[in-house]
Amino acid sequence: MNVQLNSLSDTRKSLVVSLEASEVDAAHQEVVAEFARQARIPGFRPGKAPAAIIAKRFAKDITDEFKQRVVTKAYRDGLEKQKLDVLTVVNVEPGEVAQGKPASVTITVDVRPDFKLPDYVGLPTSVAPSEATEDEVDRVIEGMRAERAEFKVAERPAAKGDYVKLAYEGKIDGKPIAEIAPDKQIYSKVPQTWEEVEGANEGVIPGLGKQLAGLKVGDKKDVEIDFPADFAAVPELAGKKAVYAAEVLEVRERVLPPLDEAFFKAQHVGNLETLKVSVRSEIKRRKEAQNRAEQRRQVTDALTAKVDFPIPESLIESETQTVLRSFIEENMRRGVPQEQFEKDKKELFEGARQAATKRVKSRLVLAKIAEAEKVEVNEQDIDAFIYREAMRTGQKPDKLVKMLTTDREQLRAVQQSIIFDKAIDFLVSKATVTTVQPKG
């Protein structure tokens, strides 16, 4: 066997593995012998049928397995001889593989880039104070009251925070929106719906709720709406000015429950002070989790910015597809139409490729740190992963255990993910921390 190594780039290599005819024939004889041991031929005891009969009866299966065996041998022995750290097999060209003839197999692979790790101990991070302020505690308690609010009919003009029942019909340049976007009735003509007056969150029609204050039952108003240029929910309306003829049918005001015994009981506390202690603790827990997540992002960004190296193209391509698929699925769940993706596919691809490149680079660096620090995956790590996934997906832990024990690829992916997480945790544990007061 002879192995010729060609460097196509810093991370892409081509192996031309040449096998002598004797090596090819040995592989063929090995395959025929295996078929002979397993074959059941009438008139012969198991494993005793002549090789010629076996070769004739199972000719196609033997040929397929023989060619695969030669390619596998070339790949395995070629990598062993060249000591390559292969990340991806890009292409395999087996050439002609036949008995009695030498064979040449060309294997194109992407290899792990060689680079020196930068200093990764003492990376700078900043966090916000984790203690809850009185204002934050009060806002949370007000939110609890809002969740239990009652909405009572108000015999007065609508004010901020009220809910207004109204009917409306929209037109653009005098043409009913029902004709422009016939499959989107909620944007055209609705006999009744509820809108919050000057609410924090936009309703279906952007800006409609901000123009209802001061209206009372029976009032009619032409409301002008400027749809954003990037209004993906209904592309036909993007960048257009619409006029909605609205009529107020009812006004209801939000009435918050008092901070009394019934309210405290519903929150599983005895009094206001106990409630504040509970809320303060939850706010602190949430802030600490946010700080931790932010530190993880900061150390990863800081680390990858300190080192530069060529990134295997196959990893970027694969991760780009993963990023794109995730983005499209998420936005389709939000109602973004397929046509919008087609329209923006160039920008989407470029953005996905940039994100993928950054993600792959950080993983390569983290993998090298994990190796340097001897980060390993233990049984407790796998158990913790199974518990988290069971909680996140609602699956039974037993099902996840079965999946990991039967799917080796999935198990390797989980182990790799855990190693990355533990490497980031290590970086955070060694980072410097500065507490910074939030702006505003």
UniProtKB/Swiss-Prot annotation:
GO terms for molecular function: peptidyl-prolyl cis-trans isomerase activity; protein folding chaperone; ribosome binding. InterPro entries: PPIase_dom_sf (IPR046357), PPIase_FKBP_dom (IPR001179), Trig_fac (IPR005215), Trigger_fac_C (IPR008880), Trigger_fac_C_sf (IPR037041), Trigger_fac_ribosome-bd_bac (IPR008881), Trigger_fac_ribosome-bd_sf (IPR036611), Trigger_fact/SurA_dom_sf (IPR027304). It is found in: Cytoplasm. It catalyses: [protein]-peptidylproline (omega=180) = [protein]-peptidylproline (omega=0). It is an enzyme of class 5 (isomerase). GO terms for biological process: 'de novo' cotranslational protein folding; cell division; chaperone-mediated protein folding; protein transport; protein unfolding. Its main location: cytoplasm. Its EC number is 5.2.1.8. Keywords: Cell cycle, Cell division, Chaperone, Cytoplasm, Isomerase, Rotamase. Transmembrane segments: none annotated. Belongs to the FKBP-type PPIase family. Tig subfamily. Involved in protein export. Acts as a chaperone by maintaining the newly synthesized protein in an open conformation. Functions as a peptidyl-prolyl cis-trans isomerase. Consists of 3 domains; the N-terminus binds the ribosome, the middle domain has PPIase activity, while the C-terminus has intrinsic chaperone activity on its own. PANTHER family: TRIGGER FACTOR CHAPERONE AND PEPTIDYL-PROLYL CIS/TRANS ISOMERASE, TRIGGER FACTOR-LIKE PROTEIN TIG, CHLOROPLASTIC. This is Trigger factor. It comes from Opitutus terrae (strain DSM 11246 / JCM 15787 / PB90-1). The gene is tig.
